[in-house]
């Protein structure tokens, strides 16, 4: 199944490694990780990012909240089961 991240981005739920709140996860470790992986970051086009979605191939800055994305992922998982 696929999940819509906002900004016209859709990813496979199988490729998602984690969904994180943008503001809550700006620890030094996360900042270092994002700097090292900056070539994989896909920035949010519409407004301020509210969440970070880490996938196998890319890191997306999403304008949708992490709780909204979590609900979408759970819904897709329930449909898939």
From Swiss-Prot:
InterPro entries on file: RemA-like
Domain of life: Bacteria
Disulfide pattern: none
Knockout-associated phenotype: Mutation impairs pellicle formation, complex colony architecture and motility inhibition in a sinR mutant background.
Function statement: Regulates the biosynthesis of the extracellular matrix and the biofilm formation. May act as an enhancer of biofilm gene expression. Acts in parallel to the pathway that governs SinR derepression.
Protein name, UniProt field: Extracellular matrix regulatory protein B
Organism: Bacillus subtilis (strain 168)
Gene that produces this protein: remB
